[in-house]
Design a protein with these regions (language model features):
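NAD(P)H-dependent oxidoreductase Rossmann-fold/reductase module
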Residues: 14-183
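SDR active-site strand-loop-helix element
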Residues: 1-12, 55-58
Length: 183
């Protein structure tokens, strides 16, 4: 399962504000990326035959830039118009990379003997997961497939030890329960 969001950008997590209603603007990306990754860990524990990955797509030139309203939108469009092409990942290339992530055997689920996905060829290694091991089923990657660094692995280990995976799962269950309630 590929989630296009903020892979390899995990950061400080605010467990008392999981919805990020009061998280400082500068910390939102790290908080939400961590929330997603911890959620993936909770899902992987319940579905060990599925691999979960969060990928940061990089700056992809899309129509979203054209639809940004107001003064900020004008500034964004001016920047995009004059920005060098090398600042952006072409949309086709982004799609190709994410298709690779979704189908490659380099990102196996926790269970399944590494037999899922397209068989890796010589020279392609099994990716390192967010727990620091290979093949444990939860991945966080930058746009080019670079795995989350050791600092992020250590941070997520700390959150795991503090019981945050379970807290994120309970929060998600509470939110889904509230949304689907007939009351």
């Amino acid at each position: 399962m590929v989630n296009i969001a903020g892979g390899a950008t995990e950061g400080y997590f605010y467990p008392s504000d999981m919805q990020a209603l009061n998280v400082p603007f500068y910390a939102i990306r790290g908080h939400l990326s961590t929330l997603i990754t911890l959620g993936h860990e909770a899902l992987a524990a319940r579905a060990p035959g599925v691999s979960f990955m969060q990928v940061f797509p990089g700056a992809v030139r899309t129509p979203l830039f054209d639809q940004t309203p107001g003064v900020f939108g004008v500034l964004v469009r001016c920047f995009v118009a004059v920005a060098p092409r090398w600042l952006f990942v072409p949309i086709e290339e982004s799609g190709e990379r994410n298709l690779f992530f979704a189908t490659s055997g380099a990102y196996p689920a926790r269970e399944g003997n590494g037999k899922s996905g397209v068989q890796v060829v010589e020279g392609v290694d099994i990716a390192r997961c967010v727990d620091g091991n290979t093949g444990s089923g939860v991945y966080s990657m930058d746009y080019d497939g670079t795995e989350a660094g050791q600092k992020i692995v250590d941070l997520l280990k700390q959150y795991r030890e503090e019981g945050m995976v379970q807290r994120v799962w309970e929060h998600a269950q509470e939110v889904f329960g509230r949304i689907t309630s007939l009351d």
